[in-house]
Amino acid sequence: MRATAVVVGAGHAGLAMSRCLAERSIDHVVLERGEVANSWKTERWDSLRLLTPNWQSRLPGYGYSGSDPDGYRTMAETCAFLERYAEVIEAPVRTHTAVTSVRRLEDGYAVTTSRGEWRSRIVVLASGACNIAAVPAIAAALPPGIASVSPMQYRNPEALAHGGVLVVGASATGVQIADEIQRSGRPVTLAVGEHIRAPRIYRGRDIQWWMDGAGILDHRYDEIEDLRRARNLPSLQLAGYPDRRSVDLNSLTAIGVKLVGRLAAMRDGRAQFSGGLANQVALSDLKMNRLLDTIDAWAAAGALADEVGPPERFAPTRIDASPALALDLHRAGIRTVLWATGYRPDYSWLHVPVLDRKGRVRDVGGVVVDSPGLYLMGIQFLRRRKSALIDGAGDDARELSAHIARFLGGMKPSRPGNARVGADRIGELGRRIDFP
């Protein structure tokens, strides 16, 4: 079987690329190991909602059209949205077709699947950045009788063993799950590492409205001094609750969650924690306030004072004067450790020498290094700060599909340009933001 381009993955990134390839009359196929939006259907917990408001679900040729633009979609609603998008754009998706190998050929690539082999000149890796839970090696040292659970396995508190829960990690996933489990009646201890605090609503508007309008989400990969760090920053402490409330360490301690420092070691059934909790929360508060300062400056420059509320600042994060540095898990009644320690992609099937020592694809803005015709989509800060979001897939797909068209046309592709000029929309202020 042949196609000019093979797109691996039928999530939002793969579907956005499909639409953009079709607009350029580039024949292609989208290969999906499960169903459209498969990860959203099978690898998320029951109560999870998108962290971005509904109006921000913008894909090429499609967007939100309901009556609740400021709400947050459930996973079922997200899946239905993406399934409908695939239908509207008539994406050539082959479901239940698992890619088992991608190999380089003289004239392109061989893509082996569970349903035969495809030959193509172009391969777009859009299989996602969250294929495997990044559970640290320390998990192997957990004492017997204590369950080890990743967010991909977690569904709801009732499915956990009765007793206390140690949640490791305090970014968006960690704080949401800690909040839910604590409210279920199971006592939670939260091990806090690097995190970025942010209010859900600021000056009467969703924080994503501010970041979108001020151009923060449009910061580009070629404008960032340390792109590797930017791609590995933790997600903002946000949740898509229907009541639009914020979730942060203060809201968690208010309902009884105990805070400890970063989990550093596990010895003889005792968890050992870093003594740097105070520094971590102070740095997180500093980053939040720096973000709010930038937003305020942008609002003032745009004369938005009459449209939004007054500037706000939030109480510093509260922690105990002497947080516990060690915890005997059995004596403390801990029965489950939940590892909210991030995710990583799975490229075990990619048999092309383009991975670095940590298993990441080496790329420049989504154009894979040293393998012409190979492209990447859907990872954090691929081309913009918003690249991993549903809202970020469109701009990236437009630019990379233009690069693909030039490549196929025999031209030497230049660096993909900016499909949407942000400066005339947000001004230079938004492009110089020193964001954490």
Residue ranges and their predicted role:
Residues 44-67, 208-223:
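N-terminal glycine-rich dinucleotide-binding loop that anchors FAD/FMN and/or NAD(P) in oxidoreductases
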